[in-house]
Amino acid sequence: MTVQPTTIGIVGARGHTGAELIKLIAAHPQLQLVFVSSRELAGQRVAEHSDGYQGELRYESLDADAVAAKAADVVILALPNGKAEPFVAAIDASRPQTLLIDLSADYRFDPAWYYGLPELTRHTYAGQRRISNPGCYATAMQLAITPLREQLAGPPQCFGVSGYSGAGTTPSDKNNPALLADNLMPYALTNHMHEREVSAQLGVPVEFMPHVAPHFRGITMTVNLWLQQPLTREQIHARYLERYAHEPLIEIVDEAPWVSRIAGTHGVQIGGFTVAPGNKRVVVVATLDNLLKGAATQAMQNLNLALGWDELTAIG
């Protein structure tokens, strides 16, 4: 008996994350890509812009009602912050059963939406058809902090450095290689969206200082943690090993991980555990690819979870 594929569409596919999503969908044995919306690329063949996709599908310029009318089983919104609402409203009105995954920050604080960081929240998934994908920095911070969350004596301080792909494709100083050359660009040093996101999700205040670097992809997150009780390096290392023992995408390493080694891969490396004299302050380093585990890979994990498939299907 032939099993009908699950149909899926992407809105906002011109960006770097959209390109990664297309590759993952093309590798998924149970998904069929039925539309890809991009105003800038409308009319062009998807295969001309994606190495992993083979077929005659072309980009279309679709408004919210047109997306809803496509009646896809799954829709992924890969739009800038503040742009998702019309698409959500149109799908809610005509296709509420659609599985909708939003990669922007628009619904991360909405309790009606499942917040999908599988390694930390999959136990709370209860069949929701609306899934909010976490931020890239926010993913790194939460994974680095969680094993010691109950031991915290104060707000974690998080120094984040991202490749410039994290600034999107719309030209700006933060994705201009000429301005970033030999440079490190601090921005939004208080009250960043991901600072608020992590503080809300973990239930503890977090202090976050983001920077953009000249490399294209990958995040390094260095986290300073003050502890209520002294812990040795060995005890701290053991807590991380225990917490993530059954998480295939998370690797606990001894040395501080390098972003160049994580770029282009689906997982997270956490390591570099360094304890200050007195054993009540520890520094932890996490690295991940902002376009993959920070966006597209995580969306695919959430999709697989919601549809009852192996969470790592298509994630090679």
Curated annotation (Swiss-Prot):
Pathway stated in the Swiss-Prot or TrEMBL entry: Amino-acid biosynthesis; L-arginine biosynthesis; N(2)-acetyl-L-ornithine from L-glutamate: step 3/4
Signal sequence, start to end: none
Record-annotated membrane-spanning stretches: none
Keyword NADP: yes
Active site, UniProt feature: 136
Subcellular location: Cytoplasm
Catalytic activity: N-acetyl-L-glutamate 5-semialdehyde + phosphate + NADP(+) = N-acetyl-L-glutamyl 5-phosphate + NADPH + H(+)
GO biological process, one term: L-arginine biosynthetic process
GO function term, MF aspect, one: NADP+ binding
E.C. numbers: 1.2.1.38
Gene Ontology cellular component annotations, sorted alphabetically: cytoplasm
Alphabetical UniProt keywords: Amino-acid biosynthesis, Arginine biosynthesis, Cytoplasm, NADP, Oxidoreductase
Main location class: cytoplasm
Oxidoreductase keyword on record: yes
SMART domains: Semialdhyde_dh (SM00859)
Function: Catalyzes the NADPH-dependent reduction of N-acetyl-5-glutamyl phosphate to yield N-acetyl-L-glutamate 5-semialdehyde.
Family statement: Belongs to the NAGSA dehydrogenase family. Type 1 subfamily.
HAMAP family: ArgC_type1 (MF_00150)
Protein name per UniProt: N-acetyl-gamma-glutamyl-phosphate reductase
